[in-house]
């Protein structure tokens, strides 16, 4: 008797929550960390859409605490004062304009949603509202002391109640079990759905009860069809649940009603591409590595938190050769919905985004070679990264075939008859390998771009039998080559 109901439920879930609603032939969410809304709109039109990117994760769009003590650090955006859409990135009109412009060119917007807590101190917000941290009073919502959990400190990760009912680093902890609190969160998220967003990154999901989140998500509206979404689709949900094992809370508690950001992914790949594990061992990359099922996961190499505090295993723009290799592997491998980091340069962990003397955000400048200036790293504009987004689009719908390794630090694999990649760490690769590709000449999209039938990088020739001679020197700028059918010369 239960089967038809189960099938119906699964079909309903498949219309959203677990799928990112990318337009056709697009992939990957890029986190344009601390960018202004007007700059994101420009970037959607001039770069992200033409290069095949799926969407943008934006910084929290709601009013946050102005923190002058540390010269406006990045983390002030994670201290909500209200759900008024007004931040240093722009006001509601600028946000709505960006969402419309990005959707118009097929690039989706995902909101970083901070609903676990309010501020960690008192003061004034970016829209001028007041935050009374000691009295737990936020009149612009309004929230009062009765809307929060009792004050205690998150200090025992072996105790799920401590993690979920106490205060994370002193941040006033909302009680999502309250119907009123839920109603304010739902109202905020549905306002964003009305504006045309495609989904939500849920900050600090591990610090909220799964049943409360499930109830909140169940009350979200369908995506706005005026923005090109199909009828009856729910927002894509990707939840921040840091689970590296050994704690009371498991990432699996959150997979029934949304995807989960898989922190083990970048940790293990960061270790492997720095030589801490043999690349050959990546042959069974996936759940056997204690990863979630790919359909439940958002995969990433680094994010705005762990590029600062994640330790030496986390690869970032500061270690570019293995970083680009790990990203190439992520984008070449079918696992998960992939997310890319786009940073501003920083020297200390609290440092805020590029800003003028008045605290206004400075826009990234675009250099003649397509890279960014004004203090922005723009990893998404690195050739080796955006060309692998193109690779992922070209190989969509195929599996891994023709896996090869030397048993150590050299690997290669194909994606059906659409694409092929090879990697080496530490010593030269010279092999005659089966690519699975049709005969012809291909542009290696890591070393160059394929444009108008010519290639600015290496050319790789595939014979009628699908084999090619693959050479990759240990001391080259990049320890990876990638060819695909859309880069055939």
Swiss-Prot record:
The lineage of its organism: Eukaryota, Metazoa, Ecdysozoa, Arthropoda, Hexapoda. Monomer. This is Alpha-amylase. Its cofactor is Ca(2+); chloride. One of its GO terms (biological process) is carbohydrate metabolic process. The record marks 305 as: Transition state stabilizer. Its EC number is 3.2.1.1. GO terms for molecular function: alpha-amylase activity; metal ion binding.
């Amino acid at each position: 008797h239960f089967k038809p109901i189960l099938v119906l439920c699964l079909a309903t879930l498949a219309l959203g929550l677990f799928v990112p609603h990318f337009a056709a032939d697009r992939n990957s969410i890029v986190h344009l960390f601390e960018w202004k809304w007007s700059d994101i709109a420009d970037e959607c039109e001039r770069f992200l859409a033409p290069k095949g990117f799926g969407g943008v994760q934006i910084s929290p769009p709601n009013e946050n605490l102005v923190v002058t003590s540390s010269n406006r650090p990045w983390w002030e955006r994670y201290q909500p004062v209200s759900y008024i859409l007004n931040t240093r990135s722009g006001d509601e009109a600028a946000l709505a304009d960006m969402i419309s412009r990005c959707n118009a060119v097929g690039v989706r917007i995902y909101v970083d949603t901070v609903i676990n807590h309010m501020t960690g101190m008192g003061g004034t917000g970016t829209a001028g509202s007041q935050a009374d941290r000691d009295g737990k009073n936020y009149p612009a919502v309004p929230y009062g002391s009765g809307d929060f959990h009792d004050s205690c400190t998150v200090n025992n990760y072996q105790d799920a109640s401590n993690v979920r009912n106490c205060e994370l680093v002193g941040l006033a902890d909302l009680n999502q079990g309250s119907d009123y609190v839920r109603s304010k969160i739902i109202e905020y998220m549905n306002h964003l759905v009305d504006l045309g967003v495609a989904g939500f990154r849920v900050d600090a999901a591990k610090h909220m009860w799964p049943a409360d989140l499930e109830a909140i998500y169940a009350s979200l509206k369908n995506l706005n069809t005026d923005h090109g979404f199909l009828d009856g689709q729910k927002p894509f949900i990707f939840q921040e649940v840091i689970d590296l094992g050994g704690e009371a809370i498991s990432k699996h508690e959150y997979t029934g009603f949304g995807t989960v950001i898989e922190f083990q992914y970048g940790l293990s790949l960061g270790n492997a591409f720095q030589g801490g594990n043999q690349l050959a061992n990546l042959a069974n990359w996936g759940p056997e590595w204690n990863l979630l099922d790919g359909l439940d996961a958002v995969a990433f190499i680094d994010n705005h938190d762990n590029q600062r505090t994640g330790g030496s295993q986390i690869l970032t723009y500061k270690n570019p050769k293995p970083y680009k290799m790990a990203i190439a592997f992520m984008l070449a491998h079918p696992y998960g919905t992939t997310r890319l980091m786009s940073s501003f340069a920083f020297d200390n962990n609290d440092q805020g985004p590029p800003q003028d003397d008045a605290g206004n955000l400075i826009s990234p400048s675009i250099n003649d070679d397509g890279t960014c200036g004004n203090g922005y790293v723009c990893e998404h504009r690195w050739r080796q990264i955006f060309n692998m987004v193109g690779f992922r689009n070209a190989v969509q719908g195929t599996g891994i075939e023709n896996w090869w390794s030397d048993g150590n630090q050299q690997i290669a694999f194909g994606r059906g008859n659409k694409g092929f990649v090879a990697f080496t760490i530490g010593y030269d690769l010279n092999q005659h390998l089966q690519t699975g590709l049709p005969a012809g000449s291909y542009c290696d999209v890591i070393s160059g771009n394929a444009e108008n039938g010519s290639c600015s990088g290496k050319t790789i020739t595939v014979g009628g039998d699908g084999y090619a001679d693959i050479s990759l020197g240990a001391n080259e700028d990049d320890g990876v080559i990638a060819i695909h059918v859309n880069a055939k010369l």
